[in-house]
Curated annotation (Swiss-Prot):
Function: Bifunctional enzyme with both ATP sulfurylase and APS kinase activity, which mediates two steps in the sulfate activation pathway. The first step is the transfer of a sulfate group to ATP to yield adenosine 5'-phosphosulfate (APS), and the second step is the transfer of a phosphate group from ATP to APS yielding 3'-phosphoadenylylsulfate/PAPS, the activated sulfate donor used by sulfotransferases. In mammals, PAPS is the sole source of sulfate while APS appears to only be an intermediate in the sulfate-activation pathway.
Effect of G270D: In BCYM4; increases ubiquitin-dependent protein instability
NCBIfam families: apsK, PRK03846.1, sopT
Disease linkage: Brachyolmia type 4 with mild epiphyseal and metaphyseal changes: A form of brachyolmia, a clinically and genetically heterogeneous skeletal dysplasia primarily affecting the spine and characterized by a short trunk, short stature, and platyspondyly. BCYM4 is an autosomal recessive form with mild epiphyseal and metaphyseal changes. Clinical features include short stature evidenced at birth, short and bowed lower limbs, mild brachydactyly, kyphoscoliosis, abnormal gait, enlarged knee joints.
Sulfate adenylyltransferase: annotated segments: 224-614
Binding site for adenosine 5'-phosphosulfate: D79, N80, V81, R82, F91, R96, E97, E98, N99, I122, S123, K161, G174, F175
CDD domains referenced in this protein's UniProt entry, alphabetically: APSK, ATPS
Protein name according to UniProt: Bifunctional 3'-phosphoadenosine 5'-phosphosulfate synthase 2
A GO molecular-function annotation: adenylylsulfate kinase activity
Outcome following mutation: L76Q: In BCYM4; reduced 3'-phosphoadenosine 5'-phosphosulfate biosynthetic process
Keywords: ATP-binding, Disease variant, Dwarfism, Kinase, Multifunctional enzyme, Nucleotide-binding, Nucleotidyltransferase, Transferase
Effect upon mutating T48R: In BCYM4; patient with premature pubarche and hyperandrogenism; decreased sulfate assimilation; increases ubiquitin-dependent protein instability
Family membership: In the N-terminal section; belongs to the APS kinase family.
Name of the coding gene: PAPSS2
Amino acid sequence: MSGIKKQKTENQQKSTNVVYQAHHVSRNKRGQVVGTRGGFRGCTVWLTGLSGAGKTTISFALEEYLVSHAIPCYSLDGDNVRHGLNRNLGFSPGDREENIRRIAEVAKLFADAGLVCITSFISPFAKDRENARKIHESAGLPFFEIFVDAPLNICESRDVKGLYKRARAGEIKGFTGIDSDYEKPETPERVLKTNLSTVSDCVHQVVELLQEQNIVPYTIIKDIHELFVPENKLDHVRAEAETLPSLSITKLDLQWVQVLSEGWATPLKGFMREKEYLQVMHFDTLLDDGVINMSIPIVLPVSAEDKTRLEGCSKFVLAHGGRRVAILRDAEFYEHRKEERCSRVWGTTCTKHPHIKMVMESGDWLVGGDLQVLEKIRWNDGLDQYRLTPLELKQKCKEMNADAVFAFQLRNPVHNGHALLMQDTRRRLLERGYKHPVLLLHPLGGWTKDDDVPLDWRMKQHAAVLEEGVLDPKSTIVAIFPSPMLYAGPTEVQWHCRSRMIAGANFYIVGRDPAGMPHPETKKDLYEPTHGGKVLSMAPGLTSVEIIPFRVAAYNKAKKAMDFYDPARHNEFDFISGTRMRKLAREGENPPDGFMAPKAWKVLTDYYRSLEKN
């Protein structure tokens, strides 16, 4: 026997002193701390199919989907693994068998750690896949074989590496599908026909399988919970509403009904009951189904008189302006501890703060319950066509073939500094490989304080910005976010971000002092200007959105344009404050060239002149 052969034989001898060690931590205990949705979810999703069938594409899309819904997972890709763990293996039958065995063992460890492990390997031979299944089953771990099925000609047409062409030319030997067989699975858990289905459809087929097997909660598949009465039940519910006692609600309350009914506050089914209210007040989250970010209370205040009148009723109608809007069911009344609420949400109880003033003047009781909303809330102000629901926004993005959606929340007119940030974000997304990034320009449309520019004027100004080409109309959606404004700084900015996440945004631009305002008495910033961005980067439950920090933009006097501020060239920049901008507009003067699109500036001056006339 040669020395090399002898050494190889000796290395293959198994040690007799190796004993498998049992973990001290159980899978259930591990599942409690892995991810933000409690429960052990460890399993392996084994994607098999020809090269070019779509395994890697589906694997990474499934990974992105699960992570965005707080399900911990990891994708093992065939090419990636051969760069490291299996770099010493070739493509002989023996090496292929060992490649799959190693992957199965690694996948088992990932699954045992509580992750959904997604593997994307050709794995052409049935016996190797069966061995991978046995490795998992012997460890008591679920294993799901997914056949990614695409005709050979389709796979060849997708072959960006040119491997099929080289195999047909004889340059690559033993290539699966050409001169090496692929043994199709006989009884896979799912078959994905990638020539007939979209990537999204394939992902949802796998998610449905994981739900059926109790790996993924059913609650995550329906991302948006609308509270409208189904059309086939509407007549019956309307008739019922006519027989019920009613509670008159304010315009502010109606705005919150709109927010709830359209699904912006998913998974809330109505105004918060005390349990939900306490979770939000003390943890900034809802905790009944994992950790769901919810930083602001969405509550319905009522007077002591209305509480006395209605507390014996399990259900009653909410009415506004004499119109029955919704039925509130399984009502629960609890004390409205206003000072505590304001302290926790705003960090102050100063009644000169405009929203705190409204809270302090509202009812002494809160009522929570499930809502059945009779119809979509419309304001008939000429702007309803911009009030797109989360589902409508998702559909709009789908029609635009968006592969990234970046949201910009605003309650002020758009100047070229804002536009620079949005343009720069789009540029960065394109550099990262996205093909069709879409901007969601999403002005807040609910209640705002008296000195803010009203919604109708802001919408005219935004339209002028698009008309002048400062932002690209073809890749921009302008829609109205129906929420009232709280001016609650870092607490509120989480709500702004999370609601856009619900609507499909996966990038969120956060600015300086988001949702902030000057302290009503000291006139200094009520919140530290950088805290909003810092809090968003740490906030729990915002797993499917990436925070894009707001770079400081100012007017560059040399360039005569808005530019990103460089402290080394401080003297070149002019910081044009909102106060100065409003003063110029009131006096009919123009700002420096390049500060704002001329047509957009004219809208602003027209608004302030209208105030002077009135």
